[in-house]
């Protein structure tokens, strides 16, 4: 268990990085990237992360200093209460921040019901603390109260950067000034500034890693999405008859505490296989932190994933990857030529087959060439530094 920091450490400006959802290793990777980004702009900054699940998995990112989530610090409606030690000074810690950064990810989507965070963002603005929305996916919102809250926070934000093109239009429609909305890309790409290099002592990459989920697919019933995941696993096994397949996810191991737990989907998919097929499948159990996910994916010759961040981790290390996701967030890869391996119609058997065939062939493009192909996305991700540098913290 990780104890939270007691308050602001030495340094200036005071930057509070909010909204990290550490149950998802993709969000944990973003937290690492944002921490580095802030310190690259303000080398003497005091940085605290008001993140979720730090008490459970914060040890996976020991270089980050955590405090309770910002909605708990501010005591907004719907938030879990902050620990007793914070009851009297959570708001003061936020008030003493010179900048609050809402770190990128995909939580600003109506189906996630992020109401406490929306209340917290408005309260940050009302306290007079500059608020930066950094590297977000922003969806459409229909609920009148949510729209009103977003109009207040986005309209008053010191900066708004989004990671995909549809989010630009959504942010503007929700009140952000068009001239202030910057299209960037996923912040986790900043963790891979250099091309992959082969380590002489490292074993050759082998086997295929598969990430299954029913949370990032096209609309439909949970049963339909679970069947699609099982079908995808079977299709991979058919194509790699003499290789082992490893199942893991960047969102697993915490059960209901993490809201989404792909371990359940993976387990159900395995039960649909024949006994012979099951013997070829290895399952990674428990929570997988960002570094463990990055290292595990790098050991495989190919990756097939229904989640975005495993694809970004693998591609950034030169691992041929099929990304089968129907969501706005895949726009982080706009301008990157992945061919059929970027499959935005995962329910289409032909499109799915083309994606698998593209990356499971022995001569699939990989290594430095694949890393270089990500240059457009990495370049957009780097714009987030300019976004931060253009903010004048309230010091």
Predicted regions and their residues:
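Active-site anion-handling motifs in enzyme catalytic cores
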Residues: 1-395
């Amino acid at each position: 268990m990780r104890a939270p920091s007691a308050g602001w450490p030495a340094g200036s400006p005071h930057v509070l990085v909010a909204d990290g959802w550490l149950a998802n290793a993709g969000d944990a990777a973003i937290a690492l990237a944002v921490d580095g980004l802030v310190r690259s702009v303000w080398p003497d900054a005091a940085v605290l992360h008001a993140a979720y699940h730090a008490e459970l998995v914060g040890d996976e990112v020991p270089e980050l200093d955590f405090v309770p989530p910002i909605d708990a610090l501010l005591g907004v409606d719907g938030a879990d209460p902050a620990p007793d030690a914070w009851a009297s000074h959570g708001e003061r810690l936020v008030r003493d921040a010179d900048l609050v950064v809402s770190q990128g990810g995909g939580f600003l989507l109506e189906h996630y019901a992020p109401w406490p965070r929306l209340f917290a963002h408005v309260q940050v603005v009302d306290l007079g603390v500059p608020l930066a929305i950094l590297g977000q996916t922003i969806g459409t919102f229909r609920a009148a109260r949510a729209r009103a809250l977003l109009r207040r926070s986005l309209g008053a934000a010191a900066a708004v950067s989004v990671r995909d093109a549809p989010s630009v239009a959504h942010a503007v429609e929700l009140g952000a000034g068009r001239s202030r909305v910057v299209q960037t890309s996923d912040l986790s790409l900043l963790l891979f500034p250099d091309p992959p290099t082969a380590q002489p002592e490292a074993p050759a990459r082998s086997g295929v890693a598969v990430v299954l989920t029913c949370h990032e697919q096209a609309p439909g019933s949970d049963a339909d999405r679970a069947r699609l995941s099982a079908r995808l696993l079977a299709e991979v096994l058919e194509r790699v008859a003499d290789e082992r397949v490893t199942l893991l996810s960047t969102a697993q191991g915490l059960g209901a505490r993490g809201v989404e737990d792909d371990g359940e989907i993976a387990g159900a998919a395995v039960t649909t296989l024949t006994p012979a097929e099951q013997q070829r499948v290895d399952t990674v159990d428990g929570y997988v932190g960002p570094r463990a996910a990055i290292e595990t994916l790098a050991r495989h010759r190919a990756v097939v994933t229904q989640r975005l961040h495993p694809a970004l981790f693998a591609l950034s290390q030169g691992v041929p990857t099929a990304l089968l996701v129907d969501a706005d967030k895949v726009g982080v890869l706009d301008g990157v030529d992945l061919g059929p391996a970027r499959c935005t119609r995962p329910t289409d058997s032909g499109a799915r087959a083309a994606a698998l065939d593209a990356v499971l062939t022995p001569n699939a493009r990989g290594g430095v060439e694949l890393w270089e192909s990500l240059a457009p996305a990495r370049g957009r991700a780097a714009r987030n530094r300019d976004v931060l540098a253009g903010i004048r913290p309230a010091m």
